[in-house]
Amino acid sequence: MEAITKQYLELFAEHSLELRERPQLLGHYREGAYDTFARLGLPRFKSEDYQRTDLAKLFAGDWKLLLSEGSPYWASHAFPQGIFIGSLSDFVRLYPEVAKEHYGRIASVETDALVALNTLFAADGFVVYVPRGAKMPGHIELRSILPSRAGHISVERALIIVEDDAEATLYFEDCPEGTGRAMALRTLEVYVGRRARFALIDREESSAERIRITSTYVRQMKQSAVNLSALTLANGTTRNNFFITLAEEEA
């Protein structure tokens, strides 16, 4: 086992009791995530998918873990048509079956070490749920999933569910206010049902000292349409991974 892999497994051990108190659904996937990360470690520099991104160098050093009950930029709300926007912990409580159907099943915990690391440390998350046939008026705007703090890794998780014949647009404005070297490790899981429409605009404007690594996994069903836009205006090191599964024909 490489030293940096061992370092992050030991960091998990330091926070394991605290993480154990988080929603059971998140804990359900931790054991598998632990095994995956222990087996794979970080993707190697110059490997097929990481020709220009040295993850071991980015993750090296005495990073601390930023755990939070949620971001000051969002709170849970129920909207007309049954639309829910808010924390994963609240969503699990209100819609346990829907959460169980999608969380941890779109992003590849078994084969993606970065998703495994995110799943291992995820303490909460942000959810957009648009039920069957609902149309989101305008767009949802989110300033940040978690705040930025120097010397810390913020582990950010989002779950977006747009059911059959529903429509939604999500605008991430990632403009952290903190200063100093900081990292955001993000995993977004997106489910788009049959004949549904979803657009994601992800705008980053950060400092030269910030590191942001995002893995976005999308699962599209029959006749669905998805529009993804990632705009980086100012940054330090940014890595945006997109994985799209066209699960049914005409997606």
Regions found by a protein language model. Give the residues of each.
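Conserved beta-strand/loop scaffold segments within soluble protein domains that form the structured core
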Residues: 94-251
